[in-house]
């Protein structure tokens, strides 16, 4: 990898680290300014500072920023980081830039798990865990189908993922057909759309540790993932 002002000797430069911290922070503050109630940047910053100082100038503005928009922004940042790490990990594991959770059937599997959990009126944590289990089942199912071919071609892996996605999509459609159209079906639809409207601090406390732990594990294994992304000859030459 060639050195640049962002990466030198395989490591991020101080400028890159500062940029990665400032960009989501500034973007998040700007996003909290927009909505049905438009707010100036100064009011948003003052409301955030009020969390630590305890001095609230405008209770309405404070409620909108801190209780509504801030948890949505935090959840969007954490979920985005998790999706980024998941996509990059898939591509490294399978040495294929096309190997994404969508193509390998993971997305469809997790959707089936979430739909089933919502129909059974499970809690937030139970819904996430069941979705995770079904996602792993989808991965194993895809690998099992692709393993039937001895050539080891990534084309068969992608085709197996398409088969898994079609199967789990069909199961998901059947489950949605049996769901209560007045209660469960809207909740399922909002979940599948990935809306952050219902984001709360409680949901952040429940879901964030799972995502952050996964990101930490991926970070600790980053060098091994880099080796897996190389071809066989490149990996041997690297030791």
Q: Where are each of the predicted segments found?
A:
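Alpha-helical transmembrane segments in inner-membrane proteins
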Residues: 1-238
